[in-house]
């Protein structure tokens, strides 16, 4: 018999829905977490979630601008809603996120049908902004502001795993990256507020949390408290120790890390704290020191390799994932080959790859040594083939092993399989036993014997 535990939906405080909403999210985990908070705000206001984007009374696009392709996708989606707006003037159109912050007033000139344009720093102010819209105003909220503490329960997409923002913005100035200009300066949340949110998640039967930040291991640099030794008291390492005792939470993850701040002390904490999962996402971006210098990344390949060595010395089976950019302006064939060599030498579990895309208001965008599009395509194809082969090889180490898998739901493509993730963040499909009574709840951790290993997922059977 299969039983399924689903968290009860919170009821809207309004007696009746004031309309339906639809949110489409583009981009990173930070955007997804922001969307969950905005959905919570809308439901607190009395909106209900629509079953169809083209029937919603309020449509919100939470946007990304890290690459041009993500930006163009937003304009394509907007085109469908603009046609609706002409026949349904009461339809509210909202563009939030990084594209909204980047374009600001110019986006309103390009798409005058928009009701609200709001940058990431204004996510927690959505209700007030919509009240201004209801008063007949078109609103552009992109001014830099202090991010108010979120007091609204997020409308979370998962009932098992929850995202928790701990630091907003980024103070780094990588020459290719638009994030600092669209998400603002670093603003760290105070540890007690973070722990309180995690405790609420635990009370609602969440089993795993992922701490989020654009530059997460820089957490606490802007907080005032220091130790007697002069060290910042509120670092990511300190936070991990502080939240580790929350009852009910079984797994803790964090992302995204910057190599410049990934310390031995942090690695030691991850080893000592048994709830912290053995999965580390540490972008390297390029395997060549000169390209890293031009990118203004602030570390060398030797330093990066030393970080991986330190992790694996304590946690030999840890999963290491990363980001890489190919065809950065001026990248020679030899420099590109250095990136391929690094992937082979380190043996990453997965690498998220992209060809360089010039972004507005970044130094690299105006350099005159841009790489031809054809070369970009060739390099991206080659690196993706290497990543797939490397990932497949790395995953073979799981074969015939028994892994702890946190069950998150059913496989949407096969109702006779559950799916979840190992502590090392490997997506795993688990066969539901036949001909025996088997009780489970989503959120259970099951021992699974791995029977098949592919490039980006595993399959297995319950092991008793």
Swiss-Prot record:
Its EC number is 2.8.4.3. Residues 396-464 form the TRAM domain. One of its GO terms (biological process) is tRNA methylthiolation. Its main location: cytoplasm. Belongs to the methylthiotransferase family. MiaB subfamily. [4Fe-4S] cluster 2 binds at residues 170, 174, 177. Its cofactor is [4Fe-4S] cluster. GO terms for molecular function: 4 iron, 4 sulfur cluster binding; metal ion binding; methylthiotransferase activity. It catalyses: N(6)-dimethylallyladenosine(37) in tRNA + (sulfur carrier)-SH + AH2 + 2 S-adenosyl-L-methionine = 2-methylsulfanyl-N(6)-dimethylallyladenosine(37) in tRNA + (sulfur carrier)-H + 5'-deoxyadenosine + L-methionine + A + S-adenosyl-L-homocysteine + 2 H(+). [4Fe-4S] cluster 1 binds at residues 28, 64, 98. Residues 19-135 form the MTTase N-terminal domain. It comes from Prochlorococcus marinus (strain MIT 9515). Monomer. It comes from the Bacteria. Binds 2 [4Fe-4S] clusters. One cluster is coordinated with 3 cysteines and an exchangeable S-adenosyl-L-methionine. Keywords: 4Fe-4S, Cytoplasm, Iron, Iron-sulfur, Metal-binding, S-adenosyl-L-methionine, Transferase, tRNA processing. Residues 156-393 form the Radical SAM core domain. It is found in: Cytoplasm. InterPro entries: Elp3/MiaA/NifB-like_rSAM (IPR006638), Methylthiotransferase (IPR005839), Methylthiotransferase_CS (IPR020612), Methylthiotransferase_N (IPR013848), Methylthiotransferase_N_sf (IPR038135), MiaB_methiolase (IPR006463), rSAM (IPR007197), rSAM_horseshoe (IPR023404). This is tRNA-2-methylthio-N(6)-dimethylallyladenosine synthase. It is an enzyme of class 2 (transferase). CDD domains: Radical_SAM. One of its GO terms (cellular component) is cytoplasm. Catalyzes the methylthiolation of N6-(dimethylallyl)adenosine (i(6)A), leading to the formation of 2-methylthio-N6-(dimethylallyl)adenosine (ms(2)i(6)A) at position 37 in tRNAs that read codons beginning with uridine.
């Amino acid at each position: 018999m299969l039983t399924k535990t689903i968290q009860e939906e919170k009821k809207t405080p309004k007696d009746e829905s004031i309309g339906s909403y639809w949110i489409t999210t583009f981009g990173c985990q930070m955007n997804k977490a922001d969307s969950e908070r905005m959905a919570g705000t809308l439901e607190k206001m009395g909106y209900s979630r629509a079953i169809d984007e083209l029937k919603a009374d309020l449509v919100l696009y939470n946007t990304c601008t890290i690459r041009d392709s993500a930006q163009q996708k937003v304009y394509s989606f907007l085109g469908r809603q603009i046609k609706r707006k002409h026949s349904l003037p009461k339809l509210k159109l909202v563009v939030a996120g990084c594209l909204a912050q980047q374009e600001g007033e110019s986006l309103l000139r390009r798409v005058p049908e928009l009701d609200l344009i709001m940058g990431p720093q204004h996510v927690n102010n959505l209700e007030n902004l919509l009240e201004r819209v209801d008063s007949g105003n078109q609103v552009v909220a992109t001014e830099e502001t202090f991010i108010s503490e979120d007091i609204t329960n997020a409308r979370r997409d998962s009932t098992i795993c929850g995202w928790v923002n701990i630091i907003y913005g980024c103070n780094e100035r990588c020459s290719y990256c638009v994030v600092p200009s669209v998400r603002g300066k670093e603003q760290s949340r105070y540890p007690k507020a973070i722990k309180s949110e995690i405790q609420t998640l635990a009370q609602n039967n969440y089993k795993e949390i992922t701490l989020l930040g654009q530059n997460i291991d820089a957490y606490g640099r802007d907080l005032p408290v220091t130790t007697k030794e002069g060290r910042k008291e509120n670092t990511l390492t300190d936070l991990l120790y502080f939240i580790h005792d929350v009852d009910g939470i079984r797994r803790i993850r964090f992302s995204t890390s910057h190599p410049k701040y990934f310390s031995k002390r942090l690695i030691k904490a991850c080893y000592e704290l048994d709830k912290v999962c053995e999965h580390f996402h540490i972008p390297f971006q390029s395997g060549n020191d000169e390209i890293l210098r031009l990118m203004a990344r602030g570390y060398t390949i030797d330093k990066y390799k030393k970080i991986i060595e330190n992790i694996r010395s304590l946690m030999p089976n840890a999963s290491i994932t990363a980001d890489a950019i190919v065809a950065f302006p001026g990248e020679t064939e030899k420099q590109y080959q250095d990136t391929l060599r690094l992937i082979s030498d380190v043996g990453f579990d997965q690498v998220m790859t992209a060809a360089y895309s010039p972004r507005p208001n970044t130094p690299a965008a105006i350099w005159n040594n841009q790489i031809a599009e054809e070369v970009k395509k060739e390099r991206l194809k080659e690196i993706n083939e290497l990543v797939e082969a490397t990932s497949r090889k790395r995953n073979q180490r799981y074969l015939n092993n028994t892994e702890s898998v946190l069950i998150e739901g059913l496989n949407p493509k096969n109702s006779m399989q559950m799916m979840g993730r190992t502590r090392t963040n490997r997506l795993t499909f688990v066969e539901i036993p036949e001909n025996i009574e088997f009780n489970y709840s989503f959120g259970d951790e099951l021992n699974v014997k791995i029977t098949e290993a592919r490039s980006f997922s595993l399959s297995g059977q319950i092991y008793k």
